[in-house]
């Protein structure tokens, strides 16, 4: 199994507590990872061909050992993280910059909230000015496309181009079509998830949860516990694991959503 990228949810603790969070993160969330476990697991994966690790959550800046993990893995492989940005200021920002991550993306979950868009633009540009490669994870819902188009244009006008923005369609319900996502991106080439047009696993990617479970995708409920915190344990957990589609069905309770697809072995 030629895994090249792993995503690790360090915690399911997050002060933002978005209702749509695939990780069901809450302010009182928890973790089952120690710093030594994360470092040892990632180092073993790197020794077996993994080239990059992405840290998420929950909110990775609410995981107390994040900076130590980044520092201890410096030079081992490409290290990135995605944050909601609520803590990205003052001493926390200074410590993150000092830990020298290879890339940081700040999320815009609510493009209709002008204050959030303004904050994220400032944080992304501040990170870049301090030598940290940075970008935006931009969530798009089908029911709010006009606000998404306007906010995305604001981000691009601020000097953050599509090469630094990942446009993410809402999953489960209120899911935009690929064409609608392209309109938000300004009808120019853009980055999104590999499953944008078709649900299916990538043999290059694995998602590892805060509870030490593994999956082909961060959004799916098809998960399996790691038998050991090693690359071999990750491969064992992924082998034969299905992939349940993360979309919903059309119903009267919400906006149009994608239709479910069958399990993929």
Task: For every predicted segment, state its role.
Residues 4, 30, 36, 44, ...:
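Acidic-enriched, low-complexity/disordered segments with a strong bias for Aspartate over Glutamate
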Residues 1-94:
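Conserved alpha-helical substructure of the radical SAM core
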Residues 1, 56, 60, 122, ...:
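Proteins with a high burden of low-complexity, intrinsically disordered sequence enriched in S/T/G/P/A and R
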Residues 30, 59, 86, 160-162, ...:
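Intrinsically disordered, low-complexity regions
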Residues 99-103, 107-237, 262-264:
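Radical SAM enzyme [4Fe-4S]-AdoMet core and its adjacent flexible, acidic
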Residues 22-24, 43, 65, 80, ...:
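Intrinsically disordered, low-complexity regions enriched in small/polar residues
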Residues 1-29, 43-46, 213-218, 227-265:
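N-terminal pre-core extensions flanking Radical SAM catalytic domains
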